[in-house]
Design a protein with these regions (language model features):
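Glycine/tryptophan-enriched, flexible segments
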Residues: 142-298, 302, 410-411, 415-481
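Trp/Phe/Arg-rich N-terminal binding region typifying the photolyase-homology
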Residues: 1-163, 270, 379, 462, ...
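Charge-dense, low-complexity intrinsically disordered segments
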Residues: 44, 48-52, 200-207, 318, ...
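Active-site-proximal binding-pocket segments
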Residues: 234-429
Length: 481
C-alpha cells in the first residue's frame, strides 16, 4: 500500500471540516486510526467521565466512517510504537493529523515524525482545533496576550476563519489492518455504573454536536445574553463536551452563528457573547502554549507561597455536595450525576473551595478533570486559576462569591437547587439558601433536620471570607526575584 496514509484521530472525532483528513484523502488510500494511549498525559490522562464520552464518540465515528465506505482502526498502546507498527503492517508512509495543544503533544508528534520519516514518508499536521493558531495572535509589541479582552479583540481583527469544508470521499486500502474491539477497552463504568442514564442526557458524536448547536441557535440563543447565568433555564449551548472531543469544529460554530446573526440581527448581541465564550477557549489554549506548566503550577508565582489548607473532611463534603450550602451542593451533585455543571455554578463552587475552604485550586481542577465530560486541559486549568486568583487576567482576590446571595440571585425560585437537593424541596424560598436560619417549626414542616437529613454548613460564610482575605493579604509580602 505504497500510496496509503494513516489519518491519526485524537480530539477531532468528526469527518466534516477536518483539514488534515481532507489532505489525506487527496494523497491516496486512507486508513483512519484511533490510538488509546492510557499513559499519555500522565496525571492528565482521560478522566472517568471523559472515557465514557470517548467510548460513545468512537462508536459514532466508526459508524459514520462505515457509512462512507471506510473504517476506524482501533489500537491500544504507546502512541509512537503503535503508529510504527501500523506503518510496517500496512506499508503506509505518511501520517496526517490535526494539531493538538496539550503540553505533551509536541513530544509525541516528534516521535511520530521520526517513525514516519523512517518509513520513507512524513508527518503532516494541520490546524482544525482552534479558530486562530496561538502564535498568530500577538500584542502590538509582538508578545503573547495575558488579558482576555484585548486578546479576543485582536482575534476579531484577524481575517475571518475559513468556511467549513464538507466530508471528503475516502479511498479504502486494499487490505485493512486488524482493529481491536472497542468494548474490550472498558471505557464505560460497570460496577458501580455511576454513568447510569447519561445516554438519555447526551448524544455524543458529530450528528449530536450539530443538533445541539442548531437547537441552541434556533431556540435558546435569544435568551443567552441575559439568561446564561441562570442554571434552571436552558439558555446555554451545552456544546463543551462536543468541542472537547472535536465532534464539531470552532469554524462550524463560528459560521453557523454568523449565519444565524444575519437571519436574526436582534439576537446579534447574544450571539456575540456566545462567540466570546468560544474565544475564552481560544485564550486558554493561547496561555497554555506559553506556559505549559499551567495545569500544575500557578501562573502568578506568588501563589506558590499561598497558605493553602488541607482538610480531608471538607474536601469530601465539597466533592459529594454536602457542604450545607444548597447552591454549592446542587452544583456538585449535578456534576456527579450528569457529568456536567452550569457555568455560573462552576464559578461559585470553585470560589467556595479556594476561598471559603482555602483548599488548593489543584484539588478542584483534578476533581473536575475526572468528573466533567467536557474536561479540557487548558480551559480547566485556566478557569480554576482565574477563580483562585493565581491565573492570567484572574478574578481579584477579594472577589469571594457569597453562596447564599448567589443562590438567591441566580436561582431565586429554587427550581435548580430543589431538583438536585431534594431534601430541601419543601423549604420556603426565604430560607432555602440559609436553612440554618429557619425557625424549628419551618424546618419540621419541610421535613428537614439539620445535621441529619441535611448537613449544617461546614464553615461560616462571614468568618471564612475574613480568613480568606487575611490569607490573600499575606501575598503582598512575598518578594519575587
Amino acid at each position: 500500500m505504497a500510496n496509503a496514509s494513516l489519518y491519526w484521530f485524537r480530539q477531532d472525532l468528526r469527518l466534516a471540516d477536518l483539514p488534515g483528513l481532507i489532505a489525506a484523502s487527496k494523497s491516496g488510500q486512507v486508513i483512519p486510526v484511533f490510538i488509546f494511549d492510557e499513559a499519555l498525559g500522565g496525571d492528565w490522562k482521560l478522566g472517568g467521565a471523559s472515557q465514557w464520552w470517548l467510548h460513545h464518540s468512537l462508536q459514532k465515528l466508526a459508524a459514520d466512517l462505515r457509512a462512507i465506505g471506510s473504517r476506524l482502526v482501533l489500537r491500544r498502546g504507546e502512541t509512537v510504537h503503535v503508529i510504527a507498527q501500523l506503518l510496517e503492517e500496512t506499508g503506509a508512509q505518511n501520517v496526517f493529523a490535526s494539531r493538538q495543544y496539550q503540553p505533551w503533544a509536541d513530544e509525541t508528534e516528534q516521535g511520530v515524525r521520526k517513525v514516519a520519516e523512517s518509513a520513507g514518508g512524513a508527518f503532516k499536521r494541520y490546524p482544525g482545533t482552534l479558530l486562530f493558531e496561538p502564535e498568530n495572535i500577538r500584542t502590538g509589541g509582538g508578545t503573547p496576550f495575558k488579558v482576555f479582552t484585548p486578546f479576543w479583540r485582536a482575534c476579531l481583527k484577524q481575517p475571518a476563519p475559513a468556511q467549513p469544508q464538507p466530508v471528503p470521499a475516502l479511498t479504502s486500502p486494499n487490505e485493512w489492518p486488524h482493529s481491536e474491539v472497542l468494548d474490550t477497552w472498558e471505557l464505560c463504568p460497570k460496577k458501580p455504573n455511576w454513568a447510569q442514564g447519561w445516554d438519555t442526557l447526551w448524544t455524543p458524536g458529530e450528528a449530536g454536536a450539530s443538533t445541539a448547536l442548531n437547537t441552541f441557535l434556533e431556540s435558546h440563543v435569544n435568551r443567552y445574553g441575559d439568561g446564561r447565568d441562570f442554571p434552571a433555564q436552558p439558555n446555554t449551548s451545552r456544546l463543551s463536551p462536543f468541542l472537547k472531543f472535536g465532534e464539531i469544529s470552532p469554524r462550524q460554530i463560528w459560521w453557523t452563528a454568523q449565519n444565524a446573526k444575519q437571519r436574526s440581527p436582534n439576537e446579534g448581541g447574544s450571539i456575540d457573547k456566545f462567540l466570546s465564550e468560544i474565544g475564552w477557549r481560544e485564550f486558554c489554549n493561547h496561555l497554555v502554549t506559553q506556559f505549559p506548566a499551567m495545569p500544575d503550577r500557578a501562573w502568578n508565582p506568588k501563589f506558590e507561597y499561598f497558605p493553602w489548607q488541607r482538610h480531608a473532611a471538607n474536601l469530601t463534603a465539597w466533592q459529594s455536595g454536602n457542604t450545607g450550602y444548597p447552591i454549592i451542593d446542587a452544583g456538585m451533585r449535578e456534576l456527579w450525576q450528569t457529568g456536567f455543571m452550569h457555568n455560573r455554578v462552576r464559578m461559585v463552587v470553585a470560589s467556595f473551595l479556594t476561598k471559603h475552604l482555602l483548599m488548593h485550586w489543584r484539588e478542584g481542577e483534578q476533581w473536575f478533570w475526572d468528573c466533567l465530560l467536557d474536561a479540557d486541559l487548558a480551559s480547566n486549568a485556566c478557569s480554576w486559576q482565574w477563580v483562585g486568583g493565581s491565573g492570567a487576567d484572574a478574578s481579584p482576590y477579594f472577589r469571594i462569591f457569597n453562596p447564599i446571595a448567589q443562590g438567591e440571585k441566580f436561582d431565586k425560585s429554587g427550581v435548580y437547587t430543589r431538583h438536585w437537593v431534594p431534601e430541601l424541596a419543601e423549604m420556603p424560598d426565604k430560607y432555602l439558601y440559609k436553612p440554618w436560619e429557619a425557625p424549628e417549626l419551618t424546618l419540621k414542616a419541610a421535613g428537614v433536620e439539620l445535621g441529619k437529613t441535611y448537613p449544617n454548613p461546614i464553615v461560616d460564610h462571614r468568618e471564612a471570607r475574613e480568613t480568606a482575605l487575611e490569607a490573600y493579604a499575606t501575598l503582598k509580602n512575598v518578594a519575587m526575584a
